C-alpha cells in the first residue's frame, strides 16, 4: 500500500520562484543531498536529513540561470547554464561563480541531463545533443538543427537501459506533439508523431516516463484531467521513417480541468504515479498517489497553501513548493503478500523480474558514442580552472574575408562584412565572426589610425560574441571613448568584468554634453522626461510618496526644516532630469549590466566625487519617476527597474559616502536619500505586518476536509 508520510520544510529561506516556480530539483552525488535551482540567480545544495542548506552559489546581478544545475556524477562537480549560452562548472570548494570555469557556447541550451554511471548530456533548444566532455573540448563548435521551425521542446528524460544511454524529448508545434528517441550506442535518432486520439483539442499539461526492456512508457496528463499512456519502442523497426503512435487512456478524471496553478505528473515506480492538482473543481490542491495497474487512488494529501504546479521525485522523497517554502514529503510503497504476513517473504529477487530503481541503471557504459573522447582521463581530473577560456576556436577561418581585413580600406571591409552577414549562416558562421573580430582588433593595435567601428558594431549585433571571446574590443573602445560601441557591448555581452563596467561609467559621466550631441546612441531605454506629466503637489510636498504611502510618522525635524527652506530653482531641479537624455541612455546601460558587489565596490571608489554625485542625482530622479505610479515602473521599451535603481544607490553610497558627505552641494541630495530609505523601510515594515495578519487569518479559516479513500490490497500467493 502506498503511503505519504508527514511533510517537512526543507528550508525556511524563501526561494526566488517565478510565475512558473523553480527551475528544478536534481540529485547530487550524495544520496541525501539535492541541488535546488530557483528561477533567478541562485543554486542551493540541501541535505534532506538535516533539513538545512550546505552551500549556495549565485550568478552576477543582471545574469539569470536558464536551466537547472546538475551534478556530474563522474567528477562530483556541478554544472549550470546562465543566459542560455554561458556554461559554468564548479565544486563545493568554490565560493563565487564568477571565478569558476566558464565556457560560452555557440547555441542556446535547453537542459543538461545527468544520471549515475555516465557523463552529462547537453540538449540544445534546436534538438541537437552533445556529451559534456566533447562540448568542452570545443565550446564554439557548430550545433546542428534537428527540429523544425516553430517546434519547441516541452519535456525531456535521460535513461540508462542495459548499459546503453537513451534520451527522449517531446516537442510541440501548432498543437501537435512529437517524440524524439536518441540511442547513443547506435547513434540512431527516431521521430514519432504522438496522436492525441479522439480528444484532439486537449492540451498536454505534464509528461513523465518509465522504461522497461522493450518500451518507454510515456505518460501524459492532459487538460481534460485524464492520464494517457503511449508505448514507444526503444529499438524502432524503421528508424528513417516518421512513425505515428496513438495514446491510450490510463486513468480518467484524476484532477479537475479548472486547476488554476497548473498540474504535475511524475512516475514513482512501475505501478504508481503521483499527481499534483485539484481532484474536484471546488477543492484545494492535493498530492495524490494512484495505482495505474488497478486504477485506484492509494492516498492523498491536501496542500492548503497552494503550489507552483511542480513535483520532483528522488529516492523515496517528493519535492514541491508548498506556499513559499520547499517542502519534502516522504513516500513509501510496500508490497503486501501472504508470504510477508507469514514471515516467509523471499528477499532474493527473481532474475527474470525487472524493477525500476531510482536511477534506471547504476552501471557505467563502456565506449558509448556521442563524443566519448578519452573520458577515463577526464574523470580523474577536477576542473579547477578559474579563468581559462579558449578565446578563439581552432576551426580554419575564412581566408578571403581575413585577407580583406588585413590589407583593404575600412569602406571595402565594411562592404565585405555586410555581404558576409547578408548570406545564410554557414556551419562555420560563429568561427568566422570570431576570427573576423580578432583580425580587426589586431590591425587596430598595429595601426592606430585604423578603427572600423561600423564593422565592429555589425559583428556585435550578430549575438554570437561575448567579452571572453574578444576582450580587446572594449579595451580599444575605451581608449577611443566610443560611447556608442560601449553601450552596444553592455547591452549584448553578459560577462563583462566589473572593472570594465566602471571604466565605461567613468567615460559616460565625464564626457561633455557637446560631444554627446554629436553621438548616435540607442534611446530605447529613455522616455521623454520633458513631456512627462507631473503632479503639481509633488513640488510642494517634502515627503517621498512610496506607492501611495505617506510616512507621516517621520520625525526627522531637522531634515524637514532643511527641505522646507529650499529655494524654487532647486525644487525644479529635483523634478527635472539632471542629465541630458543621451547620457541617461548610457547610464541606463550601466544599470542593466551584470555585476558582483564584491568586485564592483573597489572600482567605484576610483570615480571622482562630483561624478558620483551626478549619478546619485540621476538615480534619485529615476526613483521619483517610479514613485509617480502604482506599479513603481518607468515608461519606455527597456527602462531600469526599481531594484536596479536601489541597488546602485546603495553601491555608490557604500563606496563613496565619506567623500560625498563632505561636499556641500551633496547635502540636500543625501537628506533626500535618507528620507527615501526611511520611507522604504516603513513601507516594508507595514507590509510585513499585513502578511503576518493574513497568515493568522488563514490559520483560523483552514478547514480539514476528510475525503473517503479506498484502496485495493493485493495478496501474492506463492
UniProtKB/Swiss-Prot annotation:
It is found in: Nucleus, Nucleolus. Keywords: Activator, Methylation, Nucleus, Ribosome biogenesis, rRNA processing, Transcription, Transcription regulation. Signal peptide: none annotated. One of its GO terms (molecular function) is RNA binding. GO terms for biological process: maturation of SSU-rRNA; positive regulation of transcription of nucleolar large rRNA by RNA polymerase I. InterPro entries: NOL11 (IPR042859), Nol11_C (IPR048897), NOL11_N (IPR012584), WD40_repeat_dom_sf (IPR036322). It comes from the Eukaryota. SUPFAM superfamilies: WD40 repeat-like. Pfam families: Nol11_C (PF20998), NOL11_N (PF08168). Ribosome biogenesis factor. May be required for both optimal rDNA transcription and small subunit (SSU) pre-rRNA processing at sites A', A0, 1 and 2b. Interacts with UTP4. Interacts with FBL/fibrillarin in a transcription-dependent manner. May associate with the proposed t-UTP subcomplex of the SSU processome containing at least UTP4, WDR43, HEATR1, UTP15, WDR75. This is Nucleolar protein 11. It comes from Pongo abelii.
Amino acid at each position: 500500500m502506498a503511503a505519504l508520510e508527514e511533510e517537512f520544510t526543507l528550508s525556511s529561506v524563501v526561494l526566488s520562484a517565478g510565475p512558473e516556480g523553480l527551475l528544478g530539483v536534481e540529485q547530487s552525488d550524495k544520496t541525501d543531498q539535492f541541488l535546488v535551482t530557483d528561477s533567478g540567480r541562485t543554486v542551493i545544495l540541501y541535505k534532506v536529513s538535516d533539513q538545512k542548506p550546505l552551500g549556495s552559489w549565485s550568478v552576477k546581478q543582471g545574469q539569470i540561470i536558464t536551466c537547472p544545475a546538475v551534478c556530474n556524477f563522474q567528477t562530483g562537480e556541478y554544472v549550470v547554464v546562465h543566459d542560455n549560452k554561458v556554461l559554468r562548472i564548479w565544486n563545493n570548494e568554490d565560493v563565487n561563480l564568477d571565478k569558476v570555469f566558464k565556457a560560452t557556447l555557440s547555441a542556446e541550451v535547453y537542459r543538461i541531463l545527468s544520471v549515475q554511471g555516465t557523463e552529462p548530456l547537453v540538449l540544445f533548444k534546436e534538438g541537437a545533443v552533445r556529451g559534456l566532455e566533447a562540448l568542452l573540448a570545443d565550446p564554439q563548435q557548430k550545433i546542428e538543427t534537428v527540429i523544425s521551425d516553430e517546434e519547441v521542446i516541452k519535456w525531456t528524460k535521460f535513461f540508462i537501459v542495459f548499459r546503453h544511454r537513451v534520451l527522449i524529448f517531446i516537442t510541440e508545434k501548432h498543437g501537435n506533439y512529437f517524440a524524439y528517441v536518441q540511442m547513443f550506442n547506435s547513434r540512431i535518432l527516431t521521430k514519432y508523431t504522438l496522436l492525441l486520439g479522439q480528444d484532439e483539442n486537449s492540451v498536454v499539461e505534464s509528461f513523465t516516463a518509465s522504461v522497461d526492456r522493450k518500451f518507454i512508457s510515456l505518460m501524459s496528463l492532459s487538460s481534460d484531467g485524464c492520464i494517457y499512456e503511449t508505448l514507444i519502442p526503444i529499438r524502432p523497426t524503421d528508424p528513417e521513417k516518421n512513425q505515428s503512435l496513438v495514446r491510450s487512456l490510463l486513468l480518467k478524471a484524476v484532477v479537475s480541468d479548472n486547476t488554476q496553478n497548473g498540474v504535475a505528473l511524475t512516475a514513482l515506480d512501475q505501478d504508481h504515479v503521483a499527481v499534483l492538482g485539484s481532484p474536484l473543481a471546488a477543492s484545494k490542491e492535493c498530492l495524490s498517489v494512484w495505482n495505474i495497474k488497478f486504477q485506484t487512488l492509494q492516498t492523498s494529501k491536501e496542500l492548503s497553501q497552494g503550489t507552483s504546479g511542480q513535483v520532483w521525485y528522488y529516492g523515496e522523497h517528493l519535492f514541491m513548493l508548498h506556499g513559499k517554502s520547499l517542502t519534502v514529503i516522504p513516500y513509501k510503497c510496500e508490497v503486501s503478500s501472504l508470504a510477508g504476513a507469514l514471515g516467509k517473504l523471499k528477499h532474493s529477487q527473481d532474475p527474470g523480474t525487472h524493477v525500476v530503481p531510482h536511477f534506471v541503471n547504476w552501471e557505467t557504459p563502456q565506449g558509448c558514442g556521442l563524443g566519448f573522447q578519452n573520458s577515463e582521463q577526464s574523470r580523474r581530473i577536477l576542473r579547477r580552472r578559474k579563468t581559462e577560456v579558449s578565446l578563439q576556436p581552432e576551426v580554419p577561418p575564412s581566408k578571403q574575408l581575413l585577407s580583406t581585413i588585413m590589407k583593404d580600406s575600412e569602406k571595402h571591409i565594411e562592404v565585405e562584412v555586410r555581404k558576409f552577414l547578408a548570406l545564410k549562416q554557414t556551419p562555420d558562421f560563429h568561427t568566422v565572426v570570431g576570427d573576423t573580430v580578432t583580425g580587426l582588433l589586431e590591425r587596430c593595435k598595429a595601426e592606430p589610425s585604423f578603427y572600423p567601428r561600423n564593422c565592429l558594431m555589425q559583428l556585435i549585433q550578430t549575438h554570437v560574441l561575448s567579452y571572453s571571446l574578444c576582450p580587446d574590443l572594449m579595451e580599444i573602445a575605451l581608449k577611443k571613448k566610443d560611447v556608442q560601441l560601449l553601450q552596444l557591448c553592455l547591452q549584448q555581452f553578459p560577462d563583462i568584468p566589473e572593472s570594465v563596467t566602471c571604466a565605461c561609467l567613468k567615460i559616460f559621466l565625464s564626457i561633455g554634453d557637446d560631444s554627446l550631441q554629436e553621438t548616435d546612441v540607442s534611446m530605447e531605454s529613455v522616455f521623454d522626461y520633458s513631456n512627462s506629466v507631473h503632479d503639481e503637489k509633488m513640488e510642494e510636498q517634502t515627503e517621498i510618496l512610496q506607492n501611495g504611502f505617506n510616512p507621516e510618522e517621520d520625525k526627522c525635524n531637522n531634515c524637514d526644516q532643511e527641505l522646507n527652506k529650499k529655494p524654487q530653482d532647486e525644487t525644479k531641479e529635483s523634478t527635472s532630469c539632471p542629465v541630458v537624455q543621451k547620457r541617461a541612455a548610457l547610464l541606463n546601460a550601466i544599470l542593466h549590466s551584470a555585476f558582483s558587489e564584491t568586485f564592483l565596490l573597489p572600482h567605484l571608489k576610483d570615480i571622482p566625487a562630483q561624478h558620483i554625485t551626478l549619478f546619485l542625482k540621476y538615480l534619485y530622479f529615476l526613483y521619483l519617476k517610479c514613485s509617480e505610479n502604482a506599479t513603481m515602473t518607468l515608461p519606455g521599451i527597456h527602462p531600469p527597474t526599481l531594484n536596479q535603481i536601489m541597488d546602485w544607490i546603495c553601491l555608490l553610497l557604500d563606496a563613496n559616502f565619506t567623500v560625498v558627505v563632505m561636499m556641500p552641494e551633496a547635502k540636500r541630495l543625501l537628506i533626500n536619500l535618507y528620507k527615501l530609505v526611511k520611507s522604504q523601510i516603513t513601507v516594508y515594515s507595514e507590509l510585513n505586518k499585513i502578511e503576518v495578519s493574513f497568515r493568522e487569518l488563514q490559520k483560523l479559516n483552514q478547514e480539514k476536509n476528510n475525503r473517503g479513500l479506498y484502496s485495493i490490497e493485493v495478496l501474492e500467493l506463492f
